[in-house]
Design a protein with these regions (language model features):
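Short coil/turn motifs at beta-sheet boundaries
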Residues: 37, 74, 180-184, 189, ...
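Mid-core helix/loop region of P-loop NTP-binding domains shared across ATPases and GTPases
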Residues: 169-193
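Conserved ATP-driven motor cores of ASCE-family P-loop NTPases powering translocation/secretion/packaging/pilus
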Residues: 14-22, 33-44, 50-60, 233, ...
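P-loop NTPase catalytic phosphate-binding loop
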Residues: 58-169, 191-277, 281-285, 319, ...
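Primarily NTPase-proximal linker/entry elements flanking Walker-type ATP/GTP-binding cores
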Residues: 1-88, 92-97
């Protein structure tokens, strides 16, 4: 239920928000959420029960280009992952916290769109390999990732050259044709956006020898470059892991600072929650630490505006997600630079023996 209130002179939305707990008890509802609609008007959203106990996504929720409904917020609205608004995101969570479920929903939501999906799965591909028919590239260990990341950086630089060539501004060029990113390019010239999924990012930082340390430094530098410059080139990062902080090594905190979106599932210690949320929404750290193990998929999402909320991802089986990727395999965009990294498709055995072809003269 929604109510809109016009504020009295001298009131501000914070005054109404401070009364939300009293209103909840007065009206006998589960929660009351207050949001500002416009100057002088606030909206009260009344929720009668805990909608995160059994997740049902809103019926009117529809996906849009680079916008994926992935979870339900505690105020009963959909949590939408908007890559145009928040290009890069860090998702943390312990084992069995629901982090993989969140990742599945992202892949399934992007699969029907004209988007190149690229994966770096440091668990030998067990998380992303089932989605291989829809992936443009897949690396399953740090060695393969070290080969893939330079290609993505070069792809980004090539796209900047394309944008720069378009900016050869002549006096007769209309203002609307001047652009600083791929979205200002004509449809016929605009390359497909790329979403890079990195699962278990900490594995990219682990080293045992001097040679591996040099490789690690190169990979981290390339990830930072993609995070800093990739948005205008249509390259977006989705970085997942169990822990992510300064103890991983050089460049970890610099990379984390570029990941604007934050999602924190259940974690094993308070330090992990602080890694995800303390620098953008400090008050959300306690909420993340309070997530119970028996509620997988529950998480806290925050952004650099300081706002945060609890969300929960609905259940999606791996087989259903893989089926969607198989059905949309024909939608993989053409990105020649990524062809060497395209995962091989398993050959399905024939139901009956195939007759041999006649030998011609």
């Amino acid at each position: 239920m929604r109510l809109r209130l016009r504020l009295a002179p001298g009131q501000e939305p914070a005054d109404v928000a401070a009364s939300a707990e009293r209103l909840r008890h007065a009206w006998g509802v589960h929660a009351v959420y207050v949001s500002e609609i416009k100057p002088g008007v606030v909206e009260l959203r009344l929720v009668g029960f805990d909608v995160l106990r059994k997740v049902r996504m809103p019926r009117r929720t529809t996906a849009d280009f680079l916008k994926v409904p992935v979870a339900l917020r505690e105020d009963s609205t959909a949590c939408v992952r908007d890559y145009r608004a928040i290009p890069h995101q860090l998702t943390l969570g312990a084992t069995l916290s629901g982090k993989s479920m969140y990742l599945r929903h992202l892949v399934v939501g992007l699969a029907p769109q004209r988007v190149a999906l690229v994966g770096i799965d440091c668990k030998r591909g067990v998380e992303l390999a089932p989605f291989a028919p829809r992936l443009s590239a897949l690396a399953t260990d740090p060695a393969q990732a070290a080969e893939l990341l330079p290609v993505l950086v070069q792809l980004m630089e090539d796209r900047y050259d394309l944008i720069k060539a378009r900016q050869g501004i002549a006096p007769s060029t209309p203002d609307e044709e001047i652009t600083s990113d791929i979205w200002g390019l004509p449809d016929a010239e605009r390359p497909a956006p790329v979403v890079l999924f990195v699962d278990e990012v900490a594995e990219l930082f682990l080293v045992a020898t001097r040679k591996e340390e040099d490789r690690r430094d190169e990979m981290v530098t390339q990830l930072i470059r993609l995070a800093q410059l990739g948005r205008a080139a249509g390259i977006y990062l989705e970085v997942c892991g169990q822990r992510f902080g300064a103890e991983l090594g050089k460049g970890a905190t610099m990379l984390r600072a570029q990941l604007t979106g934050r999602v924190c599932h259940r974690v094993n210690d308070e330090a992990s929650a602080k890694m995800a949320l303390a620098d953008i929404a400090p008050e959300a750290v306690g909420a993340a630490c309070a997530i119970a193990p028996e509620r997988p998929g529950l998480a806290v999402v925050g952004d650099t505006s300081g706002g945060w909320s609890r969300i929960r991802t609905p259940y999606l089986s791996l087989s259903d997600a893989a089926a969607v990727c198989a059905e949309t395999a024909g939608l993989v965009p053409v990105v020649p630079a990524l062809d060497p990294f395209r995962p091989a498709m398993p050959v399905q055995p024939a139901d009956q023996p195939v007759p041999p072809l006649p030998v011609s003269d």
